[in-house]
Amino acid sequence: MAGAVATVSVGLAWLGLMAAAASATQFRVGGGRGWSVPDANAEPYNSWAGRMRFQIGDQLLFVYPKEMDAVVVVDQGAYDACNTSSSVAGGGGGRYDDGNTVFTFDRSGPFFFISGNEANCRAGEKLVVVVMADRGGRHAPPPSPPAVPPPVAPVPMPSPASSPPSPAPAAATPSLAPSPVATTPSPSPSVSPMAPAPAPTTSTPSSPPAPAAMAPSPSTTPGGVAQPPPPPGTDGANATTPAAPAANDRSGAAAAAPVVAGVVVTSLGAYIGYAMLAI
């Protein structure tokens, strides 16, 4: 991937250079006479340069005899002093002695050229060129290739077994204790005075009826025969039936039982006595 990006960047830069070269203008310094000491009738180099419009990407062509001359790119101080031993290092500067030098302007601003022969420089073989800033983008320098980013190491995928970190437990908000609710005491049940239990009635055994009055003595009938008295119980007026004891009073019945038995025995005895008398 990185190699492909670098190849594309170099290709774009090369295309930019080719486009700039195709639209650039090459100027021959000195015309047909070339790079040499100008004569009295020739136009000075700086006057010629002042009439030209130099753009970034334009070129200067220096033609000279390489055994006798050279081209030196210097700064303004060396230009004024014709110091051939001081050349500008880098940026297209330096000393050229190949006899057919092509110099390309790679920036805007002034450029200073002098002859490699000091005597020729002092005789007027020197040149100042001011390159104009490129306002229309015609000779824009080729874009520098973009920096190739370093390969990114693959991020290891987390294993399925690894569980995501558990979120920090949220701080428990202390719960407010509920305000105590005043409880109204329920009224205690009023104790109603209990009615006094009725006193148990003591069953008084009814007194046994008085024994029946002794039967009247047998009356004497007119015939002189003594009539026996009627049996007890036959005369409703004279017979006295003992009152039956209360059914629900067991203690009274138990107490009256001997009395009743005595009355019965007495009545039977009287009846038997009357019977004996009648016989």
Swiss-Prot record:
Induction: Accumulates in response to thiourea (TU, a non-physiological thiol-based reactive oxygen species (ROS) scavenger), TU supplementation under salt stress (NT = NaCl + TU), hydrogen peroxide H(2)O(2) and H(2)O(2) supplementation under salt stress (NH = NaCl + H(2)O(2)). CDD domains: OsENODL1_like. Disulfide bonds join 82-121. Specifically expressed in reproductive tissues. Mainly observed in developing seeds and in mature leaves. Coiled coil: none annotated. A lipid is attached at residue 251 (GPI-anchor amidated serine). GO terms for cellular component: plasma membrane; side of membrane. Residues 1-24 form the signal peptide. Residues 252-279 form a propeptide. Belongs to the early nodulin-like (ENODL) family. May act as a carbohydrate transporter. Promotes tolerance to salt stress in a redox-dependent manner. This is Early nodulin-like protein 18. It comes from Oryza sativa subsp. japonica (Rice).
